């Protein structure tokens, strides 16, 4: 079966659409953006936020989280059935920041979920507008991917922390649908499957009975999603083995870890979408821009143009560097957490530096942080060029890569060689070549051995001037091949904790 992505474009996944032509897709994505924008404007009115406060990214995150929580059916049901002290299952809220007498103040707001759902539906012509909710989830996921390194989660499932380039979308909720599945990295899918298999090993009823049947269907569906991300026959054949296993256990976990490692060189197809915070869409809609009429795409020039003309602010802690905070958010907006820094730097027009060198913590402010010393500054989210987002892993070749991250997952469709540390990766493939998947393993290892350093990915693809809306004149950048391009380079990023 061909990859899931070939059947429906992202935008169709994004809008649950049947087959549509490009104009219809652009309109339906635009409609989704309009809905988010209208909702945001209404929430700013409800919360009595000034224009500046409404453009504060921390307020945007709180408002986005409130609506996502209001529509989280499963968790809402769970909260109703398992009341915990001090948590009202019918309410949602969070910190809202306001400027009072020249100082930033934190105010905790609480709303009925029913009320939030009403405002959201009203902004979306009465629909639940699931696509818009998923869009916000992907924005949060992209921000997490940029901010945190998932070392602990990788180690817990038996994977190597240096495989972090495979972990796109690892914090996306289960309910993120087809659009969410499209942006998940190979490592994320492998981790979800391993967790599932481990539960089955520890709980003998996991695969049994009516519930077990549903579990099995979910397991096979996840296997198919992962299979669809692989681009070689041998990797797909191995996924068939994992999917068809009568009683998934340690052999399957081994196979999955093997496949994840192989994806560092034989990269999977992972979609990239520029999902922006609601505080970007709100002001654009308020200024009279009609996204549905004009059309919008998450993978073309549109997000770049929107960011060129947007003012977004962020709270800054005393010893943080505002330029570094801007880089963090720029990468999140462009879904570029695992992109080669050489490519990101060229497109952005300013040097994009590794996570470990950034003097900034995450965007969110913890409830116990002191507000007295908080400043705010403008986030610089503009770019020098734009480029088309890719949903392929690029073809394979090799290059020196770093200690902290041994491969990349390209975001932009731009000609370059893809760095990965072949000796480090291949060292993990010694021994264990027996068992039912041995012939496929041998074939995969052979392909990895054959990956050459001089090969170029995305041949002839370039970046474009922001005035070149139709992408007519590609500028193919030349990169310093000796330079090193990993973001989580020998890194000290914070861990992601739910």
Swiss-Prot record:
Any single GO BP term: viral penetration into host nucleus
Any single Gene Ontology cellular-component annotation: viral nucleocapsid
Residues covered by region (Disordered): 1-21
Molecular function in Gene Ontology: RNA binding; structural molecule activity
InterPro entries attached to this UniProt entry: Flu_NP (IPR002141)
Biased segments, Basic and acidic residues type: 8-21
Subcellular location: Virion; Host nucleus
Residue numbers covered by motif Unconventional nuclear localization signal: 1-18
Main location class: virion
UniProt motif (Bipartite nuclear localization signal) ranges: 198-216
Keyword annotations: Capsid protein, Helical capsid protein, Host nucleus, Host-virus interaction, Ribonucleoprotein, RNA-binding, Viral nucleoprotein, Viral penetration into host nucleus, Virion, Virus entry into host cell
Maturation and modification: Late in virus-infected cells, may be cleaved from a 56-kDa protein to a 53-kDa protein by a cellular caspase. This cleavage might be a marker for the onset of apoptosis in infected cells or have a specific function in virus host interaction.
Subunit structure as annotated in this protein's UniProt entry: Homomultimerizes to form the nucleocapsid. May bind host exportin-1/XPO1. Binds to viral genomic RNA. Protein-RNA contacts are mediated by a combination of electrostatic interactions between positively charged residues and the phosphate backbone and planar interactions between aromatic side chains and bases.
Family indicated by similarity: Belongs to the influenza viruses nucleoprotein family.
Function (record text): Encapsidates the negative strand viral RNA, protecting it from nucleases. The encapsidated genomic RNA is termed the ribonucleoprotein (RNP) and serves as template for transcription and replication. The RNP needs to be localized in the host nucleus to start an infectious cycle, but is too large to diffuse through the nuclear pore complex. NP comprises at least 2 nuclear localization signals that are responsible for the active RNP import into the nucleus through cellular importin alpha/beta pathway.
Name assigned to this protein: Nucleoprotein
Record organism: Influenza A virus (strain A/Singapore/1/1957 H2N2)
């Amino acid at each position: 079966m061909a990859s899931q992505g070939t059947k429906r474009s992202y935008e169709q996944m994004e809008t649950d659409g049947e087959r549509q032509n490009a104009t219809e897709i652009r309109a339906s994505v635009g409609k989704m953006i309009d809905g988010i924008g209208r909702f945001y404007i209404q929430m700013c009115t409800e919360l009595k936020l000034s224009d500046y406060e409404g453009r504060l990214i921390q307020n945007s995150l709180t408002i986005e989280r409130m609506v996502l929580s209001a529509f989280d059916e499963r968790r809402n049901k769970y909260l109703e059935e398992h009341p915990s002290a001090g948590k009202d299952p019918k309410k949602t809220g969070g910190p809202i920041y306001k400027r009072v007498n020249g100082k930033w103040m934190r105010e905790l707001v609480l709303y009925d979920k029913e009320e939030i759902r009403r405002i959201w539906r009203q902004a979306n012509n009465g629909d639940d507008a699931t696509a818009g909710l998923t869009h916000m989830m992907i924005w949060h996921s992209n921000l997490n991917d940029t901010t945190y390194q998932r070392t602990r989660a990788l180690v817990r499932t038996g994977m190597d922390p240096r495989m972090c380039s495979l972990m796109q979308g690892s914090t996306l909720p289960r309910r993120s649908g087809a659009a969410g599945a499209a942006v998940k990295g190979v490592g994320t899918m492998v981790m979800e499957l391993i967790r599932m298999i481990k539960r089955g090993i520890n709980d003998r009823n996991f695969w049994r009975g009516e519930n077990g049947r549903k579990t099995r269907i979910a397991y096979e569906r996840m296997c198919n999603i992962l299979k669809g991300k692989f681009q070689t026959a041998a990797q797909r054949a191995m996924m068939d083995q994992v999917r068809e296993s009568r009683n998934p256990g340690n052999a399957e976990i081994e196979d999955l870890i093997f496949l994840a490692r192989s994806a560092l060189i034989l990269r999977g197809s992972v979609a990239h979408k520029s999902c922006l915070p609601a505080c970007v869409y709100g002001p654009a809609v308020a200024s009279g821009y009609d996204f549905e009429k004009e059309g919008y795409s998450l993978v073309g020039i549109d997000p770049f143009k929107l960011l060129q003309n947007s003012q977004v602010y962020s709270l800054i802690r005393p010893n943080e560097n505002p330029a570094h905070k801007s880089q963090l958010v720029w990468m999140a907006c462009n879904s570029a957490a695992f992109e080669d820094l050489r490519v990101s730097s060229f497109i952005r027009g300013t040097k994009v530096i590794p996570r470990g060198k950034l003097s900034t913590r995450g965007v969110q402010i913890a409830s116990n942080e002191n507000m007295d010393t908080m400043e705010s500054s403008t986030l610089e989210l503009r770019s020098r060029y734009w480029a088309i987002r890719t949903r392929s892993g690029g073809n394979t070749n090799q290059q020196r890569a770093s200690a902290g991250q041994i491969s990349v997952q390209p975001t932009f469709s731009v000609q370059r060689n893809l760095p990965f540390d072949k000796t480090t990766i291949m060292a993990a493939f010694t021994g264990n070549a027996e068992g039912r998947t041995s012939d496929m393993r041998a074939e995969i290892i052979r392909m990895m051995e054959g990956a050459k350093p001089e090969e170029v990915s995305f041949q002839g693809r370039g970046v474009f001037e922001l005035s070149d809306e139709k992408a007519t004149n590609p500028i193919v950048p030349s990169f310093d091949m000796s330079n090193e391009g990993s973001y989580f380079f020998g890194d000290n990023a914070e861990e992601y904790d739910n």
